Amino acid sequence: MLEQGCKGFFIMAEGSQIDWEGHDNDFYGQYDEIEEFENAIESALAFAKNRQDTLVLVTADHETGGLLIEKDTLRYKETNQMKVSWNTAIGKGDHTGAMVPIFAYGPGSANFTGILDNTDIFFAMQEAIGINDLPDGTCY
């Protein structure tokens, strides 16, 4: 259904419950919601891997609760057999100023490396899909 449009499509999937669980300082609730969000990401990547015209971006608009995976929790360096011990710390359930990651896969993904101001993501997306300097009020 999505592939029928001649100009392509845009999908935004939000893992809002991750944020809500952070407000509640519920680590296990966050973990469950992160697993569900990971399933959505895996579906998007499976679609993108069969195409040359699909960019997948994953980021957050903020961090909530101060969830930390503390130093020295990774017990094995073998990445294909990595085990994690969850030594976690939770803050006070508010939004924080912590930097959040951005992950990109597909054409234009090189525009999403390093540390970005979140307002620059819009312009990097424009460049990735070849839309630059739209006149005011123009819809694509």
Task: Show which residues each predicted segment covers.
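A post-motif C-terminal structural segment
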Residues: 1-140
